């Protein structure tokens, strides 16, 4: 059956179109800097928000109207697969992502859970044979079930550690079977509420042991996808061990795991950590650890993970600025880890939301490309740090200066003069480039 019978394929119609079911800026075939938009952006649909989210929150029950909700159990799981590939085709997206429990219900035993997963993976595999949409990444849900109340790999209960390992083992087998580009680890319960009852050293050691086991098993079965860690500072756990990129990077370096992992950066998680989206992307990029992106945005007035669809053009531009400087995302992509608002409960809202996000990143791509092509910020930055290309600055950079030499130099200095950072000027330039790309020429006349 058709789950979205009144919606056709979403096509590019240009910025002057008033068709709500059309892309205004995302043209998958348009080339930007030698690559098509589709190749640059590598969009992905998040299975959990799009097909299992029901709109419930701590103050209200689910209210989403979904054509597949008349089913239950495995029939519901199968209907969601059918609806998913219909939406993928109509949006023309190249990728999707899922947790294990998104695609199939848990059974009474682990064996039953495996059986359910195998049946749905069979179905997904068949759909993928005739679909352009591939698996960007999958992961194991190690946070929802009560067994994970104290964590998974960091649980105080070794039985839980073993159960979590079994779920990831199965997840890696599914990843290999479906040709996943990546496999993600997000430690929603890997952290602590209070140090009064926590052996932090043991928990971190065990988390590292868990990751090493995953690396070993991936090698054993021949899964060559990229491993990704998704940092988040809190929620649901008060203090999570993968707080931000810098914290998670220190963990990977400490335990000899850096060569096996990169980061999946989520915009809203950066917000919760007190960072900008572009900050987390920059830290990952300069350390060679930028792997993939969960494309969403948070509400700056709220203190939790709101997972809104990305429509902030400054954020998408500065994100693409980092991604382009990274040479792209390689095997990663832009996954819409985003949900429609509770008040946007009709099926067509799923399309409006993805169109908005895809158009927003298309604008960001084009603006970022022009900024880099014109070297707008690079020229200013080079001039700002020019003192390190000559004289004493060059000696500092080349490692030929020491405290004795620097003291002698400083004693001969007169009054030190700095130059302006020109922040307001740079923001004006950013606005100018944004308007030139995003506002149709007729509207500017």
Curated annotation (Swiss-Prot):
Cofactor remark: Binds 2 magnesium ions per subunit.
GO molecular function terms attached to this record: magnesium ion binding; xylose isomerase activity
Q: Which UniProt keywords apply?
A: Carbohydrate metabolism, Cytoplasm, Isomerase, Magnesium, Metal-binding, Xylose metabolism
- Which positions are annotated as binding Mg(2+) 1? 230, 266, 294, 337
Active site feature: 99, 102
Catalyzed chemical reaction(s): alpha-D-xylose = alpha-D-xylulofuranose
S-S pairs: none
* Subcellular location, principal: cytoplasm
Query: Which EC number applies?
Result: 5.3.1.5
Family that this chain belongs to: Belongs to the xylose isomerase family.
| Name of this chain's protein | Xylose isomerase
């Amino acid at each position: 059956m058709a789950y979205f019978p009144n919606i056709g394929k979403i096509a590019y119609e240009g910025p002057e179109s008033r068709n709500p079911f059309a892309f205004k800026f995302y043209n998958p075939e348009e080339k930007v800097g030698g690559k098509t938009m589709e190749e640059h952006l590598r969009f992905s649909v998040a299975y959990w928000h799009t097909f299992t989210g029901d709109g419930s929150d701590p103050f209200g029950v689910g209210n989403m109207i979904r054509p597949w909700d008349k089913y239950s159990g495995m029939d519901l799981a199968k209907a969601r697969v059918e609806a998913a590939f219909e939406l993928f085709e109509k949006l023309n997206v190249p990728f999707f992502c899922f947790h294990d429990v998104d695609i199939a219900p848990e059974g009474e035993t682990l064996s039953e859970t495996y059986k359910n997963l195998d049946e749905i993976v069979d179905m997904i595999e068949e759909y993928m044979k005739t679909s352009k949409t591939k698996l960007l990444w999958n992961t194991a849900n190690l946070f929802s079930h009560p067994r994970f109340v104290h964590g998974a790999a960091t649980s105080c209960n070794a039985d839980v550690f073993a159960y979590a390992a079994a779920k990831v083992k199965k997840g890696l087998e599914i990843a290999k079977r479906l040709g996943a580009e990546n496999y993600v680890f997000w430690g929603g319960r890997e952290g602590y509420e209070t140090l009064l009852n926590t052996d932090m050293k043991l928990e971190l050691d065990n988390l590292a042991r868990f990751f090493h086991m995953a690396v070993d098993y991936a090698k054993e079965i021949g899964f060559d996808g990229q491993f990704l860690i998704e940092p988040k500072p809190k929620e649901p756990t008060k203090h999570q061990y993968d707080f931000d990129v810098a914290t998670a990077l220190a963990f990977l370096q400490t335990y000899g795991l850096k060569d096996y992992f990169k980061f999946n950066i989520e915009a809203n998680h950066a917000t919760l950590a007190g960072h900008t989206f572009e900050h987390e992307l920059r830290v990952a990029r300069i350390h060679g650890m930028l792997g993939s992106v969960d494309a969403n945005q948070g509400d700056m007035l709220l203190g939790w993970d709101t997972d809104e669809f990305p429509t902030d053009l400054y954020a998408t531009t500065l994100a693409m600025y980092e991604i382009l400087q990274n040479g792209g995302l390689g095997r990663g992509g832009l996954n819409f880890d985003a949900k429609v608002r509770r008040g946007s409960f009709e099926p067509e809202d799923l399309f409006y939301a993805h169109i908005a996000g895809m158009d927003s990143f298309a604008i960001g791509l084009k603006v970022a490309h022009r900024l880099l092509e014109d070297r707008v910020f690079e020229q200013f930055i080079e001039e700002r740090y020019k003192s390190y290309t000559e004289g004493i600055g060059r000696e500092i950079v080349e490692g030929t200066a020491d405290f004795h030499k620097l003291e002698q130099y400083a004693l001969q200095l007169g009054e030190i003069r700095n130059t302006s950072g020109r922040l307001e000027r740079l923001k004006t330039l950013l606005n100018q480039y944004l308007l030139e790309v995003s506002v149709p020429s007729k509207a500017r006349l």
